[in-house]
Amino acid sequence: MTDKPFWQTKNLNQLTRSEWESLCDGCGQCCLHKLQDEDTDEIYWTSVACTLLNPETCQCRDYPNRKKTVPDCVFLTPEIVDEVDWLPVTCAYRLVAEGSDLYWWHPLVSGSPETVHEAGISVRGKVTAFDHDMQDDDDYLDHMVTPDKIAR
């Protein structure tokens, strides 16, 4: 038997549902809208959150039913983690897929769900609008940010 944590001994396809869910650090970055340049495919971050994101807890307000309310919500699965190029470099799913370890502030490492916020990684205090506030696509341009404005 190994004393190593599951994320150091398993790949994403080997995780139980509970392990998969616990890998989420609760940063909320995946719930921010991103823009993609049609010509270059470059991804641009915004500080506009999904209507279901609680900006204080950085958790989904209706996680079990999110696809019903937000049809384009992306369900992360082991099969698509490598294909989702907008996942933050700090994302635990991305880190495990790359064979890297989790950061000290990840709740599985620190033992506290608050460290992701204390470390400045989460979107707490950084959401400037919600998608239901946007009248048209151009409105998102007013909320463009660089990724370092989201995570310190």
Curated annotation (Swiss-Prot):
Stated family: Belongs to the UPF0260 family.
InterPro entries reported in the protein's UniProt record: Puta_zinc/iron-chelating_dom (IPR005358), UCP006173 (IPR008228)
Transmembrane spans: none
Highest taxon, organism lineage: Bacteria
Protein name as it appears in the record: UPF0260 protein BCAN_A1514
